[in-house]
Design a protein with these regions (language model features):
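Generic recognition of short, well-ordered alpha-helical segments
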Residues: 16-20, 94, 118
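Short, solvent-exposed amphipathic alpha-helical segments in soluble enzyme
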Residues: 20-24, 97-100, 122-123
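S-adenosyl-L-methionine/SAH cofactor-binding core of RNA-modifying enzymes
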Residues: 61-111, 116-117
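Conserved beta-strand scaffold positions in the cores of enzyme catalytic domains, especially
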Residues: 33-35, 81-83, 125
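Structured adenosyl-cofactor binding patch, chiefly the S-adenosyl-L-methionine
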Residues: 115, 119-125
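N-terminal nucleotide/polyanion-binding subdomain common to many enzyme families
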Residues: 1-74
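A general secondary-structure boundary signal
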Residues: 2, 103-104, 125
Length: 125
């Protein structure tokens, strides 16, 4: 299984991926986890990834552009794309069993008040 994790904090993913059962699965070639830093795909000199919501409202959301570009970098075609958010489906045993059958996953870690809805509508499974 190959898992690409799109995140603003890749330094948090790498130690977890190397520890315990995940680490053993990686060493045995069963699992490959790659952390992708969304900030690497911003088009401004300050590596800014947040913006105000398009329709207005409180808080900031992750800008669609760097997330779209990060997703393109992992060749997400034929990969199931998950967005981790408290608004979505609960991650329970049934969902984990379903996901374990996938060959390739992309996990997008949310931040701020969420992510631009345009990205969710176009890309998330």
């Amino acid at each position: 299984m190959n898992i690409d994790v799109l995140t603003l904090f890749p330094e948090m993913i790498e130690p977890v991926a190397a520890a315990s059962m995940l680490g053993r699965a990686s060493k045995n070639g069963i699992l490959k986890i790659r952390a992708v830093n969304i900030r690497d795909f911003t088009q401004n000199k300050h590596k800014k990834t947040d913006d105000t919501p398009f329709g207005g409202g409180a808080g900031m959301v992750m800008s669609a552009q760097p997330v779209f570009d990060a997703l393109r970098s992992v060749d997400a075609q034929d990969k199931r794309i998950l967005y981790m958010s408290p608004r979505g489906r609960k991650l329970d045993r049934d969902l984990v069993t379903d996901l374990a059958a996938e060959e390739n996953l992309v996990i997008l870690c949310g931040h701020y008040e969420g992510i631009a809805q345009r990205f969710i509508d176009e890309c998330v499974d």
